[in-house]
Amino acid sequence: MKFVLLFGVLLVTLFSYSSAEMLDDFDQADEDELLSLIEKEEARAKECTPRFYDCSHDRHSCCRSELFKDVCTCFYPEGGDNEVCTCQQPKHLKYMEKAAGKAKKFGGKIRKWFG
């Protein structure tokens, strides 16, 4: 009986050690993948398309505003057959940014009063 107990403890110890090594290998692979994604994102972030400029070459290249990323909006001008795409900020996001700015300003006034 002691032999079975000793063998069981040894087996559990070896299993936990091997699973810990496998998790370390997976974590290392995830870190390497994350670093490569960050490098790609930094490279892509340098070449953003400003608001109201043509974004038909890359529809995901619009710049960020203060809080949100602009969206590439495509439309057909009146009487035209060619599609035109420009980076624009949706109205609901514009209003949310204005509200956030006012809330931030109001919070500063409250801090000034009670600060």
UniProtKB/Swiss-Prot annotation:
Propeptide stretches in the record: 21-44
Name of the protein in its database record: U3-lycotoxin-Ls1o
GO molecular function: toxin activity
Intracellular or extracellular location(s): Secreted
High-level lineage: Eukaryota, Metazoa, Ecdysozoa, Arthropoda, Chelicerata
Entry domain remark: The presence of a 'disulfide through disulfide knot' structurally defines this protein as a knottin.
Region forming the signal peptide: 1-20
Pfam families on file: Toxin_35
